Amino acid sequence: MKNLKNKHFALLYLVLFLVLAKLSPFIITALIMGLYLSIIIDYVARFLEVFIKKPRVLPRVISNVLVFLTIAYSAVNFFPVIVREAQKVFSEIDRIRSGLENIDIPGWLSSILSSISASFSEGALSLVNKIVGYVPSFITAAILIVITAFIVSSLKRLIKENVHYLFPTNPSDGKEFLKTTYTEFERFVGGQVLVAIFVGLFVGFGAFIFKIPSAFFLGMLAFVTDFVPYLGVVISAIPLLMLAFSVHGLSGLLIGTIILVAANQLEMWVLAPKIQSNTLNVHWFIILIMILILGDLFSFGGVLIALPFLIFLKNFWKQYVMGG
C-alpha cells in the first residue's frame, strides 16, 4: 500500500514537471541543460583525478574551467562565423545570379532562380530577427544554466536529506527510486560524453583533411552540440556548410554534407547503439521516437527532456507497475 502511494506521488511529480515544461519552456530547458552540464563536469573531473591526486579540489576546478571555456569558445565563435560566411554566401549568390543574366536561359528558369535567391535572403533575415528577439531570454537561460551547474551537488544533498517530504509514506522506497533514476541518467550523460568526443574528432579532422577553415572550431562545436540529441548535427551543420561553400563552392557543400552525414551515421548506427542503448538498456529506436514525440510537443526543450523522461518512465514502470 505504501509503495502504491509512492507511485501516485511519483506520477504527480512527473505530470507537474511536464506542465511546467509546457508553461515555462525556457526555464525548464535551462535547468535540464544545467543538470547535463553538471554531470559532464563531474565526469571530466573524475577523469582528471586519475592523473591529479592532490589537491583534491584541483581536478574539479580544472574540469569547470575546461568545460566552460569549451562552451564559451564555441558560442563566441559561432555567430561571427555565421555572419561573416553569410555575407560571402550572399555575395556568391549575387555573382552567380549576375552571371546567369548574361546567359540566354529560359524565363521560367530565371524566375525560379530569382525566387530561390529572394526566399533565401528573406529566410536568413527572418532568422536573424528571431535570434535577436530571443536574446534576453537566452541571457536569462544562460545565467540559470551556470547557476544550476554549480548547485546541483547541493540540490542532490538537499533532496536526499528531505526525501521524506517528497515520499512521506515510504521515504526509503522513494529514495531508491530517485537514486536509480538519477544514476541511470548520469550514466547516459557519461556515455554521451564519449559519443560527443568521437563526433567532434571526426568532424574536426574531416574539416582539416578537406582544408575547410576553422577546423578546430567546427570540431569543438560538433562536440558541444552533440549533447542536443539529433538536433546538434543541424546546429553544427550551418557553419560547416557555409565555410565549405566559401572555400570550395558547390563541391564544398557536397564535402561538408558527406562529413556531416558520415558523423551522424557513425553516431546513430555504431556509437549510440553500443554506448547509449546499452547504458539505458532501451532500444535506440525507442529513444529516437521519444525524442521526436516530446520535441513535437515541447519544441527544443522536449528534445532535452526526452531522455530524463524516458528514464523516469522506465523506472516508474519497473518499480511501481511491475513491482520491481
UniProtKB/Swiss-Prot annotation:
Segments traversing the membrane: 12-32, 62-82, 105-125, 131-151, 190-210, 227-247, 252-272, 285-305
GO BP of this protein: transmembrane transport
Main location: membrane
Alphabetical keyword list: Cell membrane, Membrane, Transmembrane, Transmembrane helix, Transport
Domain of life: Bacteria
Membrane topology category: Multi-pass membrane protein
Recorded GO CC terms: plasma membrane
Pfam families per UniProt: AI-2E_transport (PF01594)
Subcellular compartments: Cell membrane
Family, as annotated: Belongs to the autoinducer-2 exporter (AI-2E) (TC 2.A.86) family.
Protein name: Putative transport protein TM_1187
